[in-house]
C-alpha cells in the first residue's frame, strides 16, 4: 500500500442490489480503516456511506438487449473513462460488484495495469456459459461468492474464490416470527395460509399467474379457511396480475400486497413461487415451498441444452438434492402443483422436515458477509 495516502478502494455497482452490497462493504471497511477513501460508480446507499461517485449507478442500470444496444456507446465510454481514471489513481483494490458484463472486462483492463481486482458476487457460471470462468480467472485476483457450491466450482478451475456467506442470510432471523408477520398482514393465526409469488418480470407473471391462481382455487376446496397472499414487486406487475385474475379466478379472495414478499413468506404455511432469489428468501423465511416455472417452448428447449445443473432452485442446489419440488414447463399445471402443496399446508412431517433443513442451510450461509468481504479486500490490499 502507498504510504503517503489513505487506503483507496475503487468500486463499481450497477444496480440497487449492488448498491446495498457496496454500502455494507464500505461500512465494514470504515470500521477497520476510518480514513479509507472510496471512489467509483455508486448508488445512494454507497454515497451515504461516503463513496465519491464519479458516475451515478443509474448510468449502468440498463436491462434488456434493446436498451443495452441503445446505450452501448455511453456504456463503452464510461468503461474506457473509468479504466483511464482508475489507472491514474492506482487504488489499492478495485471491487466490481455484480454487473458482470460491465465489470469483468473493466477488472481485466485494471489487472493488466497492475491493480488488484475483486469480483463481488459470482455470475451463474456454474449453471450456464461455464467457459466464462476462464475470463473471470484472467480478469480478477479473487471472486467473492455467496454460496458454497460456487466456491467448489471455481476451485475446479483454480480460480481464487472465497465463500463469504450470503448477506440475505445475515439479514434474516434463524427463527422468524410467523404470528407477528400474520398480524402485519391481517391473517388469522389459526388459518391456513398460502403465498403466491409469480415472479418479478412481466413475462413470468404472464406465464405463471393463471396456473398459480387455479392451484389456489383447488386448494381452497380442500381448505375452505385458506388465506391467499400475493406480494407483487411493483404497481405494473400488480395491474398485470389483477387483469389475469379477473379472467381466471374473479371470485377467489386474495390479499394483494405491494412488495412485502418477506412478510408474506414468513406468514405462510406454504408458498408457490417462480424460481430465482425468491426461492432462497423463502428458504430463509422457513416457509415450505413448491417451485413452478414455465417459459416459451423454444426458450425452455435452449435452457435445457445450456444449463448444466440438475436443479433450478437455490434451496435444491444448496442441499444437493430435491429438497423442494420443482414442477417445470408442462409439469407446471394446477393439479400437480396442488398435489405437491397439499402435504405442506397440512403442516405435518413433510413441512417440519423441510423447515429443519432450511434452518441448517441458513446457518451454513450465515457468515457475516460484509465482514468477510472486508477481510478479503484488506488482505488483497497488503
Swiss-Prot record:
GO terms for cellular component: membrane. Transmembrane segments: none annotated. One of its GO terms (molecular function) is lipid-A-disaccharide synthase activity. GO terms for biological process: lipid A biosynthetic process. It comes from the Bacteria. Pathway: Glycolipid biosynthesis; lipid IV(A) biosynthesis; lipid IV(A) from (3R)-3-hydroxytetradecanoyl-[acyl-carrier-protein] and UDP-N-acetyl-alpha-D-glucosamine: step 5/6. It holds the Pfam family LpxB. InterPro entries: Glyco_trans_19. It catalyses: 2-N,3-O-bis[(3R)-3-hydroxytetradecanoyl]-alpha-D-glucosaminyl 1-phosphate + UDP-2-N,3-O-bis[(3R)-3-hydroxytetradecanoyl]-alpha-D-glucosamine = lipid A disaccharide (E. coli) + UDP + H(+); a lipid X + a UDP-2-N,3-O-bis[(3R)-3-hydroxyacyl]-alpha-D-glucosamine = a lipid A disaccharide + UDP + H(+). Its EC number is 2.4.1.182. Keywords: Glycosyltransferase, Lipid A biosynthesis, Lipid biosynthesis, Lipid metabolism, Transferase. PANTHER family: LIPID-A-DISACCHARIDE SYNTHASE, LIPID-A-DISACCHARIDE SYNTHASE, MITOCHONDRIAL-RELATED. Condensation of UDP-2,3-diacylglucosamine and 2,3-diacylglucosamine-1-phosphate to form lipid A disaccharide, a precursor of lipid A, a phosphorylated glycolipid that anchors the lipopolysaccharide to the outer membrane of the cell. Belongs to the LpxB family. This is Lipid-A-disaccharide synthase. It comes from Salmonella paratyphi B (strain ATCC BAA-1250 / SPB7). The gene is lpxB.
